[in-house]
A protein has these predicted regions:
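Solvent-exposed, polar/charged alpha-helical surfaces in well-ordered, non-transmembrane soluble domains
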Residues: 1, 19, 23-27, 32, ...
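Pocket-flanking alpha-helical
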Residues: 1-3, 33-38, 131-169, 192-193, ...
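Short, solvent-exposed loop/beta-turn-alpha elements that line the ligand-binding surface or hinge
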Residues: 1-19, 55-75, 138-145, 166-193, ...
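Alpha-helical secondary-structure segments
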Residues: 1-47, 91-100, 195-213
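Solvent-exposed loop/turn segments at secondary-structure junctions
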Residues: 31-34, 41-45, 52-56, 97-101, ...
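Short, solvent-exposed loop/turn and secondary-structure capping segments
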Residues: 36-40, 48-49, 103-105, 161-164, ...
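Structural transition elements
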Residues: 45-82, 99-106
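Ligand/substrate-recognition segments at binding pockets and active sites
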Residues: 81-156, 169, 225
Length: 251
């Protein structure tokens, strides 16, 4: 989910309030509910920017927001109050069903309900056809984009942590939401050429910790891999390569 309220082109532009709104949202999201009730455990909660199973993965969002993975209205209320944000916050939440599937309607109806818990947000849930959606979401030199908060999915081009960072957080990224953080940008460049696995893993964790504070995006769910095999079939392996390994399968 991409979040950019109170952006530079908005009439009430305020960086501190914008960050508080993002952090309040992060405190209210219940990923377990989305994974179990909407997707029947075909997705799992994601509390990091690098998926579980890849180098550098760390559940930074779980520690920073909510109560150990569960939502916290009290924390959300406090962060908004401390920033001087008047509640309820009017928030337009955009999603797309023809590209991301019919379950998106149920997912974002649940998110709307979660965000409105405690009366902190008033959410206007909207759906747009994909071609228009993909145009309207981006930031240009004249606009912060038409959608303050919107759905965005991702399937990696290759199985490496960098493919979950560079496309989202480097300057000139494909998300094109106007986000820029020099420290994060420099660290992403650094990890891409590190050959020491332990050193790179630490750099990757540092990037996630910084982004957990910025919250230019809020990860929600990670796809779960599933294989069905007979009881007499052994050696079925599912891993971060996203490839089914026939060489290990025996009967």
């Amino acid at each position: 989910m991409k979040i950019q309220p109170f952006g530079e082109s908005q009439p009430n532009a305020d960086a501190n309030k914008a960050k508080a709104v993002r952090q309040a949202v992060a405190n209210l999201i219940d990923r377990d509910e989305l994974a179990t009730k909407v997707y029947k455990k075909t997705y799992t909660p994601m509390y990091s920017y690098i998926p579980d199973g890849l180098a550098g993965h760390e559940d930074t969002l779980k520690a920073a927001y909510g109560e150990n993975g569960k939502p916290s209205v009290d924390k959300a209320r406090k962060v908004l109050k401390d920033a001087g944000v008047t509640t309820p916050v009017d928030l337009k939440l955009q999603y797309n069903g023809d590209h991301y599937g019919s379950s998106s309607a149920d997912e974002y109806a649940a998110i709307k309900s979660q965000l409105e818990e405690g009366g902190l947000f008033s959410v206007d849930l909207q759906q747009t056809e994909w071609t228009q959606y993909n145009k309207d979401r981006v930031v240009t030199k004249d606009s912060d984009g038409a959608y303050p908060v919107y759905q965005l999915g991702w399937f990696p081009d290759y199985s490496d942590p960098d493919n979950y960072l560079s496309p989202f957080f480097r300057d000139g990224n494909f998300v094109n939401n106007g986000y820029s953080n020099k420290e994060i940008n420099d660290l992403i460049v650094k990890q891409a050429v590190q050959t020491d696995e332990n050193a790179r893993a630490e750099t990757l964790k540092q990037i996630q910790r910084l982004e957990t504070d910025d919250l230019s995006t809020i990860p929600l769910l990670q796809g779960a891999q599933t294989a069905v095999a007979g009881s007499n079939v052994k050696g079925v392996v599912l891993d971060a390569s996203f490839r089914f390994r026939y060489s290990s399968v025996t009967k």
